[in-house]
Amino acid sequence: MHAKKLDKIATAVLYSIAGIIVAILASLILYILVRGLPHISWSFLTGKSSSYQAGGGIGIQLYNSFFLLVITLIISVPLSMGAGIFLAEYAKKGPVTNFVRTCIEILSSLPSVVVGLFGYLIFVVQFEYGFSIISGALALTVFNLPQMTRNVEDSLKHVHHTQREAGLALGISRWETVVHVVIPEALSGIVTGVVLASGRIFGEAAALIYTAGQSAPALDWSNWNILSVTSPISIFRQAETLAVHIWKVNSEGTIPDGTIVSAGSAAVLLIFILIFNFGARKLGSYLHKKLTAA
């Protein structure tokens, strides 16, 4: 009886803690949405931002956030796939491999502001990229690469060893087994990790303040010269993202309706991050059922 009572008490305590955490998160989400949703309109989502006048929008910042996300994923996904495949399939157990994994763990725990300062010193100053999308994308790659590499490695390791043995038994090479057997089996976990990392990238601010810049120059949508700083597809122009815009509006306080702009921007940012998170789980579940014919 005593053991059963302790079990019930422990269960009640755990449920209470979980309930408190969920309540805090739900309250925070509702607070941001209730404050921001009334100020969101089509003109707000597509309009140009204003530095000193009321009525500005977030169109360029929203586009910059997505464009920077795409460039970051183009760089980080192949790198994380290569590193994850090596660690899961080819790396032998030993001090060198353990050291690499320790470095990955350390890098994944670095504060984003430290990564931003590193990006500023290396990409902005040393490589002379200046405040630009490519500097921000490289900094975010450094920031997210450890987590994405670990996700790929874990996803590949969760594939049962019999799958590998079956591929090798058919006479195909180890690399072909990885490409045609292991990766398709682990694809749902890999894609889920990439989408979750996308949400993290989309909402990042500290690392981009020092690398991508804090201004959003007007874009010429008829200019498709990748080297032009007014081109929407240029990676060498400054690009204030939505998260940086929220920080800037709240810190500078030069916009008369800064509170409204900040609340609306925060709601938009939160909505997209929620879409990334819930979408990752739905997409991962769909791919798992599709690939395993469950």
What is the role of each PLM region?
Residues 105-141:
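Generic hydrophobic transmembrane alpha-helix motif, especially the helices
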Residues 1-20, 281-294:
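Transmembrane alpha-helical segments of polytopic membrane transport and secretion proteins
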